[in-house]
Curated annotation (Swiss-Prot):
Purpose of the protein: Binds the 3'-UTR of mitochondrial mRNAs. Involved in the processing or stability of mitochondrial mRNAs.
Lineage: Eukaryota, Fungi, Dikarya, Ascomycota, Saccharomycotina
PTM info: Phosphorylated. Phosphorylation promotes binding to RNA.
Low complexity: bias regions: 34-57
Topology relative to the membrane: Peripheral membrane protein
Entry keyword Ubl conjugation: no
Gene Ontology cellular component terms for the protein in this record: mitochondrial inner membrane
Protein's name in the database: RNA-binding protein RMD9, mitochondrial
GO biological processes: sporulation resulting in formation of a cellular spore
Transit peptide per record: 1-62
Region (Disordered) residue spans: 28-57
Record family assignment: Belongs to the RMD9 family.
Amino acid sequence: MFRLVSSNAQGSFRSSLLTKVRIPISVPASSPLNTSTSNNTTTNNNNFGVNNSTNNTQFTRHQSSAAVDLSARKVYQDEFLRSHSSFTAPDHETKVKLNHFKELLVTGNQKLRALNRQEARAFYSVLQSLSHMLEDAKLRRSLNVDLLHQYSLLLHSAIFSSRTNRLAEKRNRDKDEYNATSYTDEVVLRGSVLNFAQLVEAGEFKYCFTDKVLQYLLYSMFQFKFNTEALNLWENGVNDAETGSVYLRPLVLATVLPRAFELKRFTYEEILHIYELNTKKEQFPHHTLVTAMGKIAIHAGDYSRALDFLERLLEKYDQKPTGLKLASLSDLHLSFIGDCKEIAIAKHFFDKVIEDELPYKVLLKVPYVTSLLDNAYQAGDSLEEAIYFWKNSVAYYMKTRQQLNSRYSLLNNKFFELFFQAYPELNEESFAMLRDLITFYAQTKPLDETFLNTIITHYSWKSKEVLDQLMQNYEIYEVERTPVSHRICLKKTGQYADYTNEEILARWNENLKCLDNSKYFYIPNADWSALRDATIYSIVPDKRTDLYYSVLNTYKNYMQDARACIKFVGNWTKRPAYLESIARITLEKNFEPAVKVDVPLFRNLKENVNYADATRDLIITARNSKPRV
């Protein structure tokens, strides 16, 4: 199957792809991997894929106070799952709750898949109800394997749905927009994951616990960076006399081991040892575990062994092709691109994707590309390699129609971070390079707001003239702007002393015009922060302080509501040096602004609150209290 990978070669996949990137590598000393090719498949009565060694040994974890018991485990059968004493036949009241739980699971899946934003957001109300229902001990003891699996899968799916939807949006998520619930929705999701984890760790679901449920849970925890909690849950579970075997199944190991290695919970040699012990009797270990081991080997710099793992995946797919095995191949291929420090190897795998020369499909995920950009720049003295990878990635995403907004944002953010590191000073070469990069991007795809936002954010040259030229590109390329770009431009003026108060006020007015056209009826805190950074937090605060307080006095009642006013002043109470001046806006009825600020005619922006009334008590309390250290 894996032939003709190269257009001019008919060797195996290894000869056309793998051997080209082989370089002299010193493989860390470790026990050899299982390479058994016995024709007789081992009959393993252990349903959890655990090595039932007769040696009662303990594997002491690096940087951990606990020990993972890798001795023989009690074999679990379905009969045990059905007859465990924790299971209780539900009474009538519990049956009613159980049916409601089932209905909520169905409703949750329907709302999660809904294209309508309102329906999708209603999902989190359902999820919160499900999480609260699990607090009922009788209900927990009435759940079966299928229901627990459905619930864990719902949590797992919600994380991906939430992040995909948010990253695809063009709008900015302001936490002061109370009607924009994506922030609070994520709080609900995080809480549900932690609540479920606590119940699992307490042993509440032993009678219906499976490796798939555990995989979903651990992966969800890792997504939210609950790393310590997840690893502790796993380590404690391994040592559980009843369900320890579940924690050593391939799906679980594939989820845990990469993160454990990343966090230095285990050394590379210890990881290999765990793998060998749990796959010794298997001719072909599970493809997800092989993928995980390949990625760990890459991170450890053991590229020779990583290539061996890739070849094993190819062999396994060749014997029995499935979509899941293809996904594993793709995942490990991406790891060679983003995690490999040998740029020649990484480039080879990158080019195979760009040139579409693979017998399997690889979606070029941006985090791996940004990592590749970083590695390429760190490995060389110039930006040449990084430019090659960036240009080809931009063109690839455009050609394959993979134009998720966040994809370009992440890619461009990393690239221009590196660009201004490589060219910290403005000169003829750096200016020409930046101009050529902008031209390339505009010729490849329509120039967008996030692209210009990224350049302006990272712009570090001292020239105000060039910065103004960059800002003019929004109009030159007819870019559709949101309040985000206006905030970025306004904030950027704080880094340059050459901007006059009139110029800053003009940018503030442009910002308000955009808010008004975007049907905002209030000025969000994000805009107040941008004004602050452009004035009293600028490199010349003495020249711009009066402007800030004058604008604040003029537009103070344009905040969203009393809660927004209190939040705004609350931030200033933590900064005693500014508190007295801020207090004047609240306490002086006849405050005289030093700078004249004219209010244009708005269609949507309006006064919403009496700022002085909303903040008076907080200001008085803050002034009377002792300054915070």
